[in-house]
Amino acid sequence: TFIFLLSTSNFLKSRYGSQFFKPIISVFQTKNELNKEYVFKNNVYIRLYQSGFEVFKKYPVFGVGNKNYRIETCSGEINSKYFCSTHPHQIFFEFLAEHGLAGSMILFFILFNLIFSKIKTILNSNNYLQLGCLIFLVTSFIPFLPSGAFFADYNLTIFWINLSIMYSVGKKTNVYTSN
């Protein structure tokens, strides 16, 4: 669905194609090391991802804490490896930087278990509302796709609303009516 929308929508083409995919593809197509370095230094998303990874390397086990990424990257002693922002704009780097390996493994286990434990039931139910919620939840975790801060009020609210609707509208997935 996303690939279809990306290929038909001019807005999505310019948003994701020119800002994210095109620079990455150009890195692999060029043999010139200076051009690769230029792309990596001037692409905002790549710099944000690198910054998130650097924060994770500094605090690998427990991370910097929830919503503390900005404090680490925007403090007075700005490290040249960091790109000052509120979050790294990618869910995996955000979880690793803020919660480390321990917290990320726990969060991903819980979230993936909630989302994927009922996937077979949802796909067989022909319930389009459940399927739409499932697609939204799965696309929230597409690797290297820029995203908003997961723990920001808006993003987390939309995520939990979709998860709640996915579970509540089906007879076999509703915890109050399932056997």
PLM region spans:
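A membrane-periplasm/extracellular boundary helix in multi-pass inner-membrane enzymes
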Residues: 1-36, 50-58, 66
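Hydrophobic core of alpha-helical transmembrane segments in multi-pass integral membrane proteins
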Residues: 1-7, 108-111, 115, 163
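Long extracytoplasmic/lumenal interhelical loops at the membrane interface
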Residues: 34-99
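Generic recognition of well-ordered alpha-helical segments
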Residues: 51, 91, 95-98, 114, ...
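Transmembrane alpha-helices of multi-pass inner-membrane enzymes
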Residues: 110, 132-145, 149-179
